[in-house]
Amino acid sequence: MKHRRVGVCSDAGPGSWGRVLSGRWTATGLLATILMAPAGVRGEPYFAVQQGAKCVTCHVNATGGGMRNAYGSTWGQRTLPAQFVETSAAADWTGRLNPYFALGGNLRANASYTDVPNQTSTNEFDVEELRLYLLVDAIPERLSVYVDERVAPGSAVNLEAWGRYWFADQRWYVKAGQMLLPFGLRLEDDSAFVRQASGINFDTPDRGVEIGLETARWSAQLAVTNGTAGGAETDDGKQVSTRAEYVRSGWRAGASFSLNETEVGDRQLAGVFAGLRTGPVAWLAEADYIEDDGFPDGQRSQWAGLLEANWAYRTGHNLKLATEYFEPDEDVDEDEQSRWSLVWEYTPVQFLQLRAGVRVYDGIPQSDLQNRRFAFVQLNGYF
């Protein structure tokens, strides 16, 4: 089988690197119960750290991202925004149409500016994505079918389509279909070095099966998939990915591992991640080590790291400061890359978030792209 090797510095345009650079973020939390009554949108793991919760508390997906359940939707409306706008509706929107069907969605529109040394700077308006979610609870809280579809821009692309069965004790589940792989922090920003270097992000779902365990303090998953990032299988190898996290009210720590066996060469990932709450600041950290045999010049050993602080200085406001590191080849000296990000996130009312930020890249002098500057403003509407 082939696997998708995602370059950390491949394109500054909106189609891939530039698109995720424009800040793939949503104003929803990683909170919520296993109530399977979702609304749309992917969340940020720092919400979970702030609230002392697990991903499954808020999301249909036990590994985070995608639809939120009833608790997560209510939190995103009543707690997250600076102001809750009262309506004539009898109850808050949760996405639940009836006991068996739920819908959700998300729209992101961007204005961005990119400055690459020795090149003409660019600025553009762009629709990053429109995504729709559908959840069918054939047996509520036990048997579900879930679909996550990107319907714009361009032609429709399926990101997730799976069925899941929870056992009676609500501790174990089994899932099969196309899904996001369990590895590291489920960051909203796919352009983060830890998500690009690992190749496991929102753009690289895969097809296979997953077994999960959820207890009061532990969240763990094991997935066996084709290892083709949703593409056609080409050999008899498979990718095995696993993630385990221990959660306390003020901190959490976890580890991940993935092995993708392919004809062109195996790819092995190992990582650790953590979260810590210190007053109004939620800290996130991740470090990943990659051994990749698929390069033409032989095996490469790589490192990627992230340290992020999120300061909720006022209701509806968050200030994010992140520093990142990427070592593309341990055998090559002085080829490291770094990135600094400062992002302001403002949720004025429910279902609406505004983001504005800058990202500064620092790489080898020979690469203009690795030394670019990027600024963006994003409007995110979600339901």
Give the ranges of each region predicted by the language model.
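Outer membrane beta-barrel
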Residues: 48, 66-68, 96-227, 236-238, ...
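Outer-membrane beta-barrel "beta-signal"
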Residues: 54, 346, 371-383
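The canonical Cys-X-X-Cys-His
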Residues: 53-62
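Outer-membrane beta-barrel proteins
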Residues: 88-94, 136-140, 167-169, 215-217, ...
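Detector for outer-membrane/organellar transmembrane beta-barrel domains
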Residues: 242-330
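Transmembrane beta-barrel strands of outer-membrane/channel proteins
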Residues: 60, 105-111, 147-151, 176-178, ...
